[in-house]
């Protein structure tokens, strides 16, 4: 039974909220962001019928984590995106508390969405349904309904289906929490997307030597890359280390061998996917030219998100830039999408003076052991020395300084700046640090320890969703 439509309220929220968001000095000029309300996980990232599609978790009615819809953008070139009709709203009993994250597939020429229907009970507790929806001729979507109930042996925290085709079968990984409150990744297979068979647990507590690795693993994504398979996921509750896993919830990757017949993934150690302050729930897709692309939510659940100043203008959060993945000699590399170079203006050398903070790309070559720093408007500071990088940012709740770290020999930095975000690519993508920051309109980028001949920058043209 369908619930009452909230579409009129959503349209009113967009009409009233969009002008405020676009006038905000912190609103991005070339990243994806909501025109009103709260945005979080990227969903359904796919190339289909000559277009790229990126769906995302969106609450258009408030800047909080209620009423999760699937909003939708599309593009022909990965640079210029346009708004599409809302794909999914929580208007059925099986998804009444949110159309949670998932993926998209091409099912014999039909764009099909696989998502989690979230249901919370008045007396406490919850359940989850894995659901399907298919695209109509007019670009809207028709819900098929649940195809997989809550698996036996797990709490109501089972979600985020990532589905793909291999040979004659569909496969799905799900993030899960077992009844002992331990994080797991589950594997299922199907011949038709409707009837699913459990193939067991492939990662998490008690698997491949892992012990205390969190109480819930979210947003899994398993894919081949180079000579290995890569599993990306978000282990909630993993123990903090002195300089690693410092965010409220981190995102990690692990490489290994995946056996389809046995339903087994033999992987190595966990690695943090992004060492910055804001990065979560990444999702990948394979392009027709063979590239594995990634996009993440430049946010973190809880933490200080509800103190961000954009709340005053009715919007919160943005996506990362799109990234290309490679796996070389045991290392996962993330590089900025090559198409982003089309946004560059004229190349500039550096005179040694401060630069006005504005959307730009910086290319900085370093010598191992160089001591240097970049100060982003007195709000965010990047320091480099022989041990690696330290990113410092003042808390939004107090005057306390918070830090994030990347350790290793720094040879080069590519820094991508937008109105309220910085993404730092280290050594050609060997490491990444992604962070939000909220400078004054007159903020400047200042430098220390940098020689002009090692520095080049390009202003970046505005390229907003239409």
UniProtKB/Swiss-Prot annotation:
GO terms for molecular function: beta-fructofuranosidase activity. This is Sucrose-6-phosphate hydrolase. GO terms for cellular component: cytoplasm. It is found in: Cytoplasm. Its EC number is 3.2.1.26. Keywords: Carbohydrate metabolism, Cytoplasm, Glycosidase, Hydrolase, Plasmid. The lineage of its organism: Bacteria, Pseudomonadati, Pseudomonadota, Gammaproteobacteria, Enterobacterales. CDD domains: GH32_ScrB-like (cd18623). Belongs to the glycosyl hydrolase 32 family. It catalyses: Hydrolysis of terminal non-reducing beta-D-fructofuranoside residues in beta-D-fructofuranosides. Pathway: Glycan biosynthesis; sucrose metabolism. The active site is at residue 41. It is an enzyme of class 3 (hydrolase).
């Amino acid at each position: 039974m369908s619930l009452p439509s909230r579409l009129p309220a959503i349209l009113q929220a967009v009409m009233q909220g969009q002008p405020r968001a676009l006038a905000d000095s912190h609103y991005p000029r070339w990243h994806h962001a909501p025109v009103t309300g709260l945005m979080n996980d990227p969903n359904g990232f796919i190339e289909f019928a000559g277009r790229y599609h990126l769906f995302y978790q969106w609450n258009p009615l408030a800047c909080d984590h209620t009423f999760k819809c699937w909003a939708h953008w599309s593009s022909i070139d990965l640079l210029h995106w346009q708004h599409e009709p809302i794909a999914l709203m929580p208007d059925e009993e099986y998804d009444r508390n949110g159309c949670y994250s998932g993926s998209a597939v091409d099912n014999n020429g039909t764009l099909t969405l696989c998502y989690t229907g979230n249901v919370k009970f008045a007396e406490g507790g919850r359940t989850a349904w894995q659901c399907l929806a298919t695209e109509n001729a007019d670009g809207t979507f028709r819900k098929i309904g649940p195809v997989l109930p809550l698996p036996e042996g797990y709490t109501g925290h089972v979600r985020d289906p990532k589905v793909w085709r291999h040979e004659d079968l569909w496969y799905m990984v799900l993030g899960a929490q077992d009844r002992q409150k331990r994080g797991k990744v589950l594997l299922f297979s199907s011949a038709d997307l409707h009837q699913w068979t459990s193939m067991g647990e492939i990662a998490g507590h008690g698997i491949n030597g892992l012990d205390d690795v969190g109480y819930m693993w979210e947003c899994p994504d398993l894919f081949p890359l180079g000579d290995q398979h890569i599993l990306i996921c978000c282990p909630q509750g993993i123990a903090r280390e002195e300089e690693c896993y410092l965010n409220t919830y981190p995102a990690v990757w692990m490489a290994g061998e995946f056996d389809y017949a046995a339903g087994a993934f033999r992987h190595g150690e966990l690695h943090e996917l992004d060492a910055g302050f804001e990065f979560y729930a990444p999702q990948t897709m394979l392009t027709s030219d063979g590239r594995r692309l990634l996009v993440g939510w430049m946010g973190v659940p809880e933490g200080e998100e509800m103190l961000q100043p954009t709340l005053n203008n009715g919007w919160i959060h943005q996506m990362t830039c799109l990234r290309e993945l490679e796996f070389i000699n045991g290392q996962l590399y993330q590089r900025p999408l090559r198409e982003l170079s089309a946004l560059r203006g004229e190349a500039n050398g550096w005179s040694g003076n401060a630069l006005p903070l504005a959307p730009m790309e910086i290319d900085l070559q370093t010598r191992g052991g160089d001591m240097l720093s970049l100060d982003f408007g007195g709000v965010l500071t990047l320091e480099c020395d022989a041990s690696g990088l330290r990113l410092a940012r003042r808390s939004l709740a107090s005057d306390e300084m918070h830090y994030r770290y990347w350790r290793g020999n720094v040879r080069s930095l590519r820094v991508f700046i937008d109105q309220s975000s910085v993404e730092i690519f280290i050594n050609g993508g060997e490491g990444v640090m992604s962070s939000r920051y909220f400078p004054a309109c007159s903020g400047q980028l200042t430098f220390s320890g940098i020689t002009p001949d090692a520095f080049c920058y390009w202003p970046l043209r505005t390229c907003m969703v239409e």
